[in-house]
């Protein structure tokens, strides 16, 4: 995400979208997906319960935007789309690496105290 943010700050919006896509690929690899294609790897994250429906939809939208930036066409990524891509990618990172861990810690603490979480 550091490179994506740097590209955005330099007004290189297409490059920022490509870096966001690269971040998605990194998340999938780090989460242990077996599928090589990003579309299928994101589906695997969803099917394994690591992301939910709306986050999956967001991730797919980011993948498409990243593809738009990565493949030559007359269509470039504008500032608003790049800003949205950064925001959505940060939300996805927070969900997987922050909120999920906090929820699991909460559940474990409650369980060790003999309480139910829900």
Annotate the PLM regions.
Residues 16-33:
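Hydrophobic alpha-helical packing segments in soluble, helical-rich domains
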Residues 9-10, 48, 72:
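Charged, alpha-helical scaffolding/interaction elements associated with membrane systems
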Residues 1-13, 117-118:
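Charged alpha-helical initiation segments
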Residues 12-20, 54, 58-61:
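Residue-level detector of well-ordered alpha-helical segments, enriched
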Residues 29-65:
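Short, charged amphipathic alpha-helical segments flanked by flexible coils
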Residues 10-13, 32-33, 75:
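Alpha-helix boundary/capping and short turn/kink residues
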Residues 57-64, 68-118:
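Charge-enriched, short contiguous segments at helix-coil
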């Amino acid at each position: 995400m550091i490179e994506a943010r740097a590209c955005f700050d330099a007004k290189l919006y297409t490059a920022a979208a490509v870096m966001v896509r690269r971040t998605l690929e990194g998340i999938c690899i780090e989460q242990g997906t077996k599928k090589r294609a990003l579309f299928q790897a994101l589906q695997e994250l969803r099917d394994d319960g690591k992301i939910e429906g709306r986050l999956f939809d967001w991730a797919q939208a980011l993948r498409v935007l990243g593809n738009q930036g990565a493949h030559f066409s007359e269509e470039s990524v504008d500032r608003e789309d790049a800003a949205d891509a950064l925001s959505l990618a940060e939300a996805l990172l927070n969900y997987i690496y922050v909120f999920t861990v906090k929820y699991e810690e909460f559940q474990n603490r409650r369980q060790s105290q003999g309480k139910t979480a829900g």
